[in-house]
Curated annotation (Swiss-Prot):
UniProt-annotated location(s): Cytoplasm
GO molecular function per UniProt: ATP binding; ATP hydrolysis activity; peptidase activity; proteasome-activating activity
One Pfam family in the UniProt entry: AAA_2
Binding site for ATP: 18, 60-65, 253, 319, 391
Protein name per the record: ATP-dependent protease ATPase subunit HslU
GO annotation terms (biological process): protein unfolding; proteolysis involved in protein catabolic process
Gene symbol of the encoding locus: hslU
Cysteine disulfide links: none
Upper classification of the organism: Bacteria, Pseudomonadati, Thermodesulfobacteriota, Desulfovibrionia, Desulfovibrionales
Length: 441
């Protein structure tokens, strides 16, 4: 578990998310409390439940990004789901327990990757021996010393990269192509369907066939195979279950869409309340049956989010409200925040586009006045059309760099400066024609 302090967590989040200090501080404390809980004596530890959070704010202000970056920072299994995709069991939609099953799948994949990294050196050593067997098949006529000498020479050539493009024949698993049929498509039957597919997979193991491939591709496949052999799959599942139960994060988006706000029809109110009541046992703490065994949700952190334009958290059923004691409102974004988003984050859009075009030999630089003009345009379009927050910057950048992105292969060595005049040239027609801006930006 991460030992970062709340201040260090906020500092790391600042590298990727601009502003929203209140939300960052709240999630940082929530993660630190998990670390604190692990240091309590067992009798008290089980009594300390996570304080689930509701983030309120319009789209594109950083709700999902904060949760996703937090999970990555702490090495926690993380899944984002949308509340509107779940309906009462028996109606069209997905069973709410599927979010826990999906989180467990992510946890197993995460631990498998970690364990594979740990045994990679041993896997590479074993894969190298198998690779040399492909290059120099066993022959009764070969003398021991002669064969070993040839093998050592091939080993040296391989390590120097001289054999990467040589082709060999290798036995691989035959991939199953074509559409996959759902065994059970009814809500609540996903778990049974997964178990049935696993059973069929064990009864009819994958067929293997000979395939010609380059040595580098064969090497990658062999390393994966050897790493899989070295892993204790039962241990992987046990660690994953522990990680999911103690540090897992489920991000429930669009929670406001299942709240009964003003002006909603009574029929839809009943359906929305049904979704909330289905969510309640999972959030309260229950045991969910997965293909890897039973998973407890008592200490999974739930972060819910929504715009709450036409409803408010108090429109949720009281029992669910009580399970989300922490509320934080995220600030809307204006031109100053857009400018900071274009300049401050470690993964700023300007750096991304400059790096992409640099692969074609085209150098793109952004002036300060050009970035401020983009920020001003984004704020203006958000105010006059639909406010989609920072996502507006993506459409702006695509529009501004559309020509150079298309012509880049024909213009290697060229330098393009995106200043205020360049921005106005590419966006002015959209600003003048308000109807056009609705479709293009």
């Amino acid at each position: 578990m991460s030992t970062l302090t709340p201040r260090e967590i906020v500092s790391e989040l600042d590298r990727f998310v601009v502003g929203q200090e209140k939300a960052k501080r709240m999630v940082a404390v929530a993660m630190r409390n998990r670390w604190r809980r692990q240091r309590l004596e067992p009798s008290l530890r089980d009594e300390v439940a996570p304080k689930n959070i509701i983030m309120m704010g319009p789209t594109g202000v950083g709700k999902t990004e904060i949760a996703r970056r937090l999970a990555r920072l702490c090495g926690a299994p993380f899944i984002k789901v949308e509340a509107t995709k779940y309906t009462e069991v028996g109606y069209v939609g997905r069973d709410v327990e599927s979010m826990v099953r999906d989180l467990m799948e992510i946890g197993v994949s995460l631990i498998r990757d970690e364990e594979a990294t740990r045994v990679r050196a041993r896997a590479e050593a074993a894969a190298e021996e198998r690779l040399l067997d492909l290059l120099l098949p066993q022959s009764p006529a070969d003398g021991g010393e002669t064969r070993q000498s040839t093998r050592d020479k091939l080993r040296g050539l391989w390590r120097q990269g001289h054999l990467d493009d040589r082709e060999v024949d290798m036995e691989v698993e035959e991939s199953t192509k074509g559409p996959q049929m759902d065994i059970f498509a009814m809500p609540g039957m996903e778990s049974m369907g997964n178990q049935f597919r696993d059973l069929m997979g064990k009864a009819f193991p994958a067929r293997r066939k000979m395939r010609k491939m380059k040595l580098r591709e064969a090497w990658n496949l062999l390393v994966d195979e050897e790493a899989s052999r070295l892993l204790d799959q039962d241990k992987v599942v046990d660690i994953a279950r522990e990680r999911v139960e103690q540090t897992g994060i489920i991000f429930i988006d669009e929670l406001d869409k299942v709240a009964s706000g003003e002006g909603t029809h009574r029929t839809t109110d009943i359906s929305r309340e049904g979704v909330q009541r289905d969510l309640l046992p999972i959030v309260e703490g229950s045991v969910v049956n997965t293909k890897y065994g039973m998973v407890r949700t008592d200490h999974i952190l739930f972060i819910a989010a929504g715009a709450f334009h036409f409803s408010k958290p108090s429109d949720l059923i009281p029992e669910l409200q009580g399970r989300f004691p922490l509320r934080v409102e995220l600030d809307p974004l204006g031109r100053d925040e857009f400018y900071r988003i274009l300049t401050e984050p470690h993964n700023a859009l300007t750096r991304q586009y400059a790096a992409l075009l640099a692969t074609e030999g085209v150098t793109v630089s952004f002036t300060d006045d050009g970035l401020r003009e983009i920020a001003a345009f984004a704020e203006e379009v958000n105010e006059e059309t639909e406010n989609i927050g920072a996502r507006r910057l993506y459409t702006m950048m695509e529009r501004i760099l559309a020509d150079i992105s298309f012509d880049a292969p024909d213009r290697p060595g060229e330098h393009v400066t995106v200043d205020a005049a360049y921005v106005r040239t590419h966006l002015e027609d959209v600003r003048v024609d308000k109807d056009l801006s609705r479709y293009i930006l």
